[in-house]
């Protein structure tokens, strides 16, 4: 079966390290394709009264660009560099096709920094050119200054699009280091502020976030046996919740965090099971011919999964209590994830990331990279992160859901795979 061959290939990668090297310890975004045709916007360099540990405007610019919705203009093309709304000359920007400008200041405040911004209407869409569309002021500790910039991005993005921003989110991923160890890491969505959650001499696979962002479930091969671990990120406590006979893999939290869906082959074929997220007796949901794996939950509580029951892997949907399954991803498809609004299914098809519109039934190929795997959608459905093969290594890739913006996150000291996008976070 093709699905079995694919799973065996993935396991082979886990146990045999491929020699590759990356210069940096952290992943960093490298732009592959810009945002031609996206909405122009300007983020003016923020005024400051001294040294600031991060360029606030640069972070906001990158966030808006990464969404694929905006095309921020370069600083050297700006007709002026105002620090406040009162200094903005609307006509100077409107003549360039810029209908909104972000201006602001960063000032030292006690042991932290105060970030203040204003979003200015330059064309009178609000009824008054020069009007302030949104503004805020926040004080952050030095270590949270990038988080503060992401908050500004979230507020600007939501005001301009009506969609909640997802720049204050993180990604979990696995790094198989060149030295042979395996690390589960977390970083801000753009690759900054990386830290190691756990490391092991044995493989780690398939991290999955709880809906509150407080826990990660993942597959560990400690004791050379696959088992599911739930890791509390606040306390650091780790609990093995599944060490059943056979392979235990592909954990996924239910929308309320109370249950885990996972795959197990204790009966010979892979099937989908559900159990309490703290462990307990599992309930088998699938059966019959074929392998069933890679469960993921929709917001309304259904389970998507990959099955080769028809001869090749395809994405199906079923109730969380089991029963009949409905084919929703035609052709050769796997690793399905539904957007939170239920309108978009993202999956791998033909070894590339594909977006499927559940309303119209139309599909769009979003990636052009090689051997794509493990797509994960941002909580607002605007961006997708996945892993792909580059040369002899695995790297992370970022693509906007409209396909306009594409980037790599290659900077690491080993193979980077199994990315998982967090839910909305507070910090």
UniProtKB/Swiss-Prot annotation:
Main location group: periplasm
Keywords assigned: Cell cycle, Cell division, Periplasm, Signal
Species, as recorded: Actinobacillus succinogenes (strain ATCC 55618 / DSM 22257 / CCUG 43843 / 130Z)
HAMAP family per record: TolB (MF_00671)
Name of the molecule in the record: Tol-Pal system protein TolB
Entries under Pfam families matching the protein: PD40 (PF07676), TolB_N (PF04052)
Subunit annotation: The Tol-Pal system is composed of five core proteins: the inner membrane proteins TolA, TolQ and TolR, the periplasmic protein TolB and the outer membrane protein Pal. They form a network linking the inner and outer membranes and the peptidoglycan layer.
Subcellular location(s) per record: Periplasm
Role description: Part of the Tol-Pal system, which plays a role in outer membrane invagination during cell division and is important for maintaining outer membrane integrity.
Cysteine disulfide partners in this protein: none
Keyword Nucleotide-binding found: no
Gene Ontology BP terms: cell division; protein import
UniProt family annotation: Belongs to the TolB family.
Entry GO CC: periplasmic space
Designated gene of the protein: tolB
Signal peptide (residue range): 1-23
InterPro entries associated with the record: 6-blade_b-propeller_TolB-like, PD40, Tol-Pal_TolB, TolB_N
Domain of life: Bacteria
């Amino acid at each position: 079966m093709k699905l079995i061959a694919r799973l065996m290939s993935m396991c082979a990668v886990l146990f045999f390290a491929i020699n590759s090297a990356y210069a940096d310890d952290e992943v960093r975004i490298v732009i592959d394709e810009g945002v031609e045709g996206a909405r122009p916007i300007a983020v003016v360099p923020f005024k400051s009264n001294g040294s600031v540990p991060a360029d606030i405007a640069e972070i906001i610019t990158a966030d808006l660009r990464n969404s694929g919705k905006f095309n921020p203009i370069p600083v050297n093309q700006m007709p002026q560099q105002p620090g406040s709304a009162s200094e903005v000359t609307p006509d100077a920007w409107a003549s360039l096709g810029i209908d909104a400008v972000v201006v602001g200041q960063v000032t030292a405040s006690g042991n932290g920094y105060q970030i203040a911004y204003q979003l200015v209407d330059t064309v009178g869409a609000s009824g008054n050119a020069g009007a302030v569309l949104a503004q805020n002021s926040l004080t952050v500790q030095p270590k949270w200054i990038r988080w503060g910039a992401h908050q500004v991005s979230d507020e600007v993005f939501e005001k301009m699009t009506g969609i909640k921003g997802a720049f204050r989110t993180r990604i979990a991923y696995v790094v198989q280091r060149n030295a042979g160890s395996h690390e589960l890491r977390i970083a801000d969505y753009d690759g900054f502020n990386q830290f190691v959650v756990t490391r092991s001499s044995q493989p780690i696979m398939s991290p999955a976030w709880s809906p509150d962002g407080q826990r990660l479930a993942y597959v560990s091969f400690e004791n050379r046996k696959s088992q599911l671990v739930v890791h509390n990120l606040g306390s650091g406590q780790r609990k093995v919740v599944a060490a059943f006979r056979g392979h235990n893999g592909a954990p996924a939290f239910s929308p309320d965090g109370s249950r885990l869906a996972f795959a197990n082959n204790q009966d010979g074929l892979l099937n989908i099971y559900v159990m309490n997220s703290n462990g307990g007796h599992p309930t088998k949901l699938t059966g019959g011919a074929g392998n069933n794996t890679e469960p993921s939950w929709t917001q309304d509580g259904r389970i998507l999964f990959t099955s080769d029951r028809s001869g090749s892997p395809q994405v199906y949907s079923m109730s969380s209590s089991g029963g009949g399954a409905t084919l929703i991803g035609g052709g050769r498809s796997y690793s399905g994830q539904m957007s939170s609004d239920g309108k978009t299914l993202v999956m791998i098809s033909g070894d590339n990331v594909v977006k499927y519109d559940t309303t119209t039934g139309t599909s769009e190929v979003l990636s052009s990279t090689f051997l794509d795997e493990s797509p994960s959608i941002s909580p607002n459905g605007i961006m997708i992160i996945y892993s792909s093969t580059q040369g002899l290594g695995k790297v992370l890739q970022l693509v906007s859901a409209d396909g306009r913006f594409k980037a790599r996150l290659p900077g690491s000291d080993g193979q980077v795979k199994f990315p998982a996008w967090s839910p909305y976070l507070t910090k």
